[in-house]
Amino acid sequence: MRLKAINQQNNSSNGNFKSARRFLGLGSAIKLYNPQNTTDAIYATTIHELAHAAHWRMIVKEPGTNRYRDYHDAEDKMVESWATGVQWYLTRMVYSKYRGRPQGTPNYTNVVIDLVDSQIDDWQNNGKTYAQGDKVEGYTMSQIESALIGCDTWNKWRDNIKRKYNNNTKQYVDEL
């Protein structure tokens, strides 16, 4: 996987993933911008874009999936929420005080965080007050990731999570 750091400010994006830029393995599918950002923000953006790349690769390798339907044409809320959750989960392993990206648009949700964290941890739920009090907890990142296969909308992903995994809080997943 090639990453390309662009030494310029970009007010609309800290980075992006485009699978088509990997044509013949020559290009960089991931571009990162805004070198003036803090190291934890650059790290988090890198993780976010790598999560997109891993999601796309998982779909390409899985028999019966459709890379256009299940990734390129998929609902932004699902694709971005997955990457946002991976970003939060992995960045906190290196930067323990990392609280996640600001909630900029409705497509970048904290649903993955809510699926993973416990109600005890919820008070610091990504440092945000709007999502406190959810009753869902205990799903693993592996479960959430594997539930993405064959999904192109949040509703399908949510239903896959509930159908595939036994969890004492799954009756509350619809509230997220």
Residue ranges and their predicted role:
Residues 8-13, 36-40, 52-53, 59-62, ...:
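Solvent-exposed loop/turn segments at secondary-structure junctions
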Residues 44-61, 80-84, 88:
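Active-site recognition of the HExxH zinc-binding catalytic motif
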Residues 66-113:
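Post-HExxH zinc-binding segment in Zn-dependent metallohydrolases
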